[in-house]
């Protein structure tokens, strides 16, 4: 019985290591891309949906640029720049769904 528990404990530790330190989740792959070209410095190109009204949305490629000095994120979509101030809670609430819907 003890050998059985020790084997499962070692198996549990190996699985914890694998899921924690290997590239298994989408966030880790997105933050540290291996061969992902769109990243260049602090801007990223992705496809997402932008909600213009309650029932209308537009989908297409967007370019997100983060400016750490002014704490802003500028989203360029079809020639229109949308500026989100990360200090403002309402702007963050508008930006998060766009980032979550990106493919």
Swiss-Prot record:
Family annotation (InterPro entries): Poxvirus_G3
KW DNA repair (keyword) present: no
Subcellular location: Virion membrane
GO biological process assignments: fusion of virus membrane with host plasma membrane; symbiont entry into host cell
Gene Ontology annotations for the cellular component aspect, listed alphabetically: membrane; viral envelope; virion membrane
Topology in membrane: Single-pass membrane protein
Induction record: Expressed in the late phase of the viral replicative cycle.
Main location: virion
Keywords annotated in UniProt: Fusion of virus membrane with host cell membrane, Fusion of virus membrane with host membrane, Late protein, Membrane, Signal-anchor, Transmembrane, Transmembrane helix, Viral envelope protein, Viral penetration into host cytoplasm, Virion, Virus entry into host cell
Membrane-traversing stretches: 1-21
Residue intervals annotated with topology Virion surface: 22-103
Processing and modification events after translation: Unglycosylated because produced in viral factories instead of the classic ER -Golgi route.
Family label: Belongs to the orthopoxvirus OPG086 family.
Subunit text: Interacts with OPG099/L5. Component of the entry fusion complex (EFC) composed of OPG053, OPG076, OPG086, OPG094, OPG095, OPG099, OPG107, OPG143, OPG104, OPG147 and OPG155. Except for OPG095 and OPG053, each of the EFC proteins is required for assembly or stability of the complex.
Physiological role: Component of the entry fusion complex (EFC), which consists of 11 proteins. During cell infection, this complex mediates entry of the virion core into the host cytoplasm by a two-step mechanism consisting of lipid mixing of the viral and cellular membranes and subsequent pore formation.
UniProt-recorded name of the protein: Entry-fusion complex protein OPG086
Species in which this protein is naturally found: Fowlpox virus (strain NVSL) (FPV)
């Amino acid at each position: 019985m003890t050998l059985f528990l020790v084997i499962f404990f070692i198996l549990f530790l190996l699985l914890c290591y694998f899921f924690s330190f290997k590239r298994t989740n989408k966030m880790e792959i997105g933050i540290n891309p291996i061969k992902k070209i769109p990243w260049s410095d602090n801007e990223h190109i992705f496809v997402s949906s932008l909600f213009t009204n309650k029932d209308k949305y537009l989908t297409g490629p967007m370019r997100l640029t983060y400016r750490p000095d002014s704490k802003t994120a500028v989203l360029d979509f079809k020639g229109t720049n949308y500026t989100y101030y990360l200090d403002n809670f309402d702007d963050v609430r508008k930006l998060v769904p766009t980032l979550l819907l990106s493919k």
